Design a protein with these regions (language model features):
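Short N-terminal targeting/anchoring amphipathic segment
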Residues: 4, 89, 144-162
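A short, glycine/small-residue-rich beta-strand->loop->alpha-helix junction that serves as a flexible
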Residues: 6-19, 85-90, 157
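Helix N-cap/beta->alpha junction signal
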Residues: 9, 37, 159-161, 185, ...
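A short beta-strand/loop micro-motif in the catalytic core of glycosyltransferases
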Residues: 25, 32-35, 199-205
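Conserved N-terminal ligand/cofactor-binding loop architecture of enzyme catalytic domains
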Residues: 32-140
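A nucleotide-sugar donor-handling region in carbohydrate enzymes
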Residues: 135-136, 196-227
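Membrane-proximal helix-turn-helix segments that form the acceptor-binding/catalytic region
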Residues: 145, 188-200
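Active-site proximal beta-strand in glycosyltransferases
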Residues: 154, 158-159, 167-185
Length: 227
């Protein structure tokens, strides 16, 4: 079996590559770590299964204006749709600052999020628009090419809130490769921090599974696993 692991930031590196996780996977087959980290990171640890483990840098890419707009609007819409106590506080804490075009972009995302926060169907529309914007980016074809060449049995994202993982997950799903992601923290669900979508979701507890079903009713119960 061939596993492809997405590592886009230090949190995933700490939680997975510095634990027994990689050893367990290497015992089952080949592992490719597709990362957006400094190149020397892959050589830090002398892994006992080095012959089954390969580090590969992702294509250089940055989140464009449209992908950011729809991702940010989706987060805000999710908070308004939940309409829970503390929503305004969370919004204030996540308010982005900027000047010129960035200030305009942030305000537009907030306005769009407020307008689409009335129903879950509108949030799904934002999610679809976000995916379309990423697929139309100039770097998306590079992700398709790499995954088509590697053809892993599963793509696992170590952190569901990372925008850098979005093109890889979308490319995998477009090619029919099963995908899974880990919900990093219990408070990521009520905060609307879901940049990537996957075929399967891994959570910490039954309570998190129940919250996942509540906040994301489009995700069937059999797609959520308690680890």
């Amino acid at each position: 079996m061939k596993f492809l692991i997405l590592l886009t930031e230090g949190i995933g590196l700490r939680n997975f590559s510095m634990t027994r996780f990689l050893s367990l996977l290497c015992g089952e087959g080949e592992v490719v770590i597709w990362h957006a980290l400094p190149e020397q990171i892959g050589h830090v640890h002398d892994h006992p299964f080095a012959d089954r483990l390969r580090w590969q840098s992702m294509p250089e890419h940055h989140e464009g204006q449209l992908p950011f707009l729809f991702r940010r609007a989706k987060l805000i819409a999710q908070l308004y749709w939940q309409n829970e106590a503390g929503t305004e506080t969370v919004l204030k804490r996540t308010t982005l600052r900027g000047k010129g075009v960035y200030k305009l972009r942030n305000r537009l995302a907030e306005a769009l999020g407020r307008a689409c926060g009335r129903s879950h169907n509108q949030i799904l529309w934002l999610d679809d628009m976000h995916a379309r914007a990423v697929r139309q980016s100039r770097y998306f074809v590079d992700f398709l090419k790499f995954l088509n060449l590697e053809r892993p049995d599963v793509v696992f994202c170590t952190h569901q809130r990372s925008p850098l993982a979005v093109p890889a997950m979308l490319a995998a799903r477009q090619l029919g490769i099963p995908t899974a992601t880990f919900i990093y923290s219990w408070d990521n669900l009520p905060k609307g921090r879901m940049a990537v979508h996957a075929d399967y979701f891994l959570v910490w507890s039954q309570h998190m599974k129940d919250e996942m079903r509540n906040y994301y009713p489009d995700v069937a119960e059999e797609r959520i696993f308690v680890t």
